[in-house]
Swiss-Prot record:
InterPro entries: Ribo_uL30_ferredoxin-like_sf, Ribosomal_uL30_bac-type, Ribosomal_uL30_ferredoxin-like. PANTHER family: LARGE RIBOSOMAL SUBUNIT PROTEIN UL30M, MITOCHONDRIAL RIBOSOMAL PROTEIN L30. Belongs to the universal ribosomal protein uL30 family. Pfam families: Ribosomal_L30. GO terms for cellular component: cytosolic large ribosomal subunit. The keyword Ribosomal protein applies. One of its GO terms (biological process) is translation. The keyword Ribosomal protein applies. This is Large ribosomal subunit protein uL30. One of its GO terms (molecular function) is structural constituent of ribosome. Keywords: Ribonucleoprotein, Ribosomal protein. NCBIfam families: rpmD_bact. It comes from the Bacteria.
Length: 60
């Protein structure tokens, strides 16, 4: 199954609380943090919410 590599590239300072919560749900705590998540609708929604703060790569 395909997976997503999500890297936080911008700070969450001065972002809305729901975006901060979304980063925490993804497991991202600091700039440069990387997590690998399953590619499903839920995780795509999380990534879409914070798209301006993260970089996403698809991996097989």
């Amino acid at each position: 199954m395909a997976q997503l590599r999500v890297t936080q590239i911008k700070s969450k300072i001065s972002e809305k609380q729901n975006q901060r919560d979304t980063l925490r749900s993804l497991g991202l705590r600091r700039i440069g943090a990387v997590v690998v998540r399953e590619d499903n609708a839920q995780n795509r929604g999380y990534v879409n919410t914070v798209a301006h703060l993260v970089k996403v790569e698809e991996i097989d």
